[in-house]
Amino acid sequence: MRRIFPSFMAVLVGFIAFWLLLFIASNVAAAIVRPTPGTMTQAYTVSNLAAYALAAAGAGWMTAWRAPRERMRHVGALAFILALLAMAGMRNPVSGQPDWFPQALVALGPLGALLGGYLGSRRQAPGAPPAA
């Protein structure tokens, strides 16, 4: 059981990081774009997609950073969770969103997490000898 805990925590930290980063990025995007309540302009839609992708990439990086070993497997677990959440969101689309918006989130979440995880997994592990 003790061997599972660090892996579980790595994915949990990434998941929490995703929501925190998404909250921050979407609020910054809303402050910049200043959407009209109840509508999704093209600029607001693009800023939401960018915020989602950046949050997923940051979460993937955090998961890889916290993973005790096999970092990309942990990131893959996070990407799977993000895909499931986005698919669940497809069942109840928000009014005013383009029809393709939920499908874009299904793709952007896992891809962003995998990209961020790849970048995070390339870092040198603490205590490892320098690469030649």
Predicted region positions:
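Juxtamembrane/disordered regions of integral membrane proteins
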Residues: 1-132
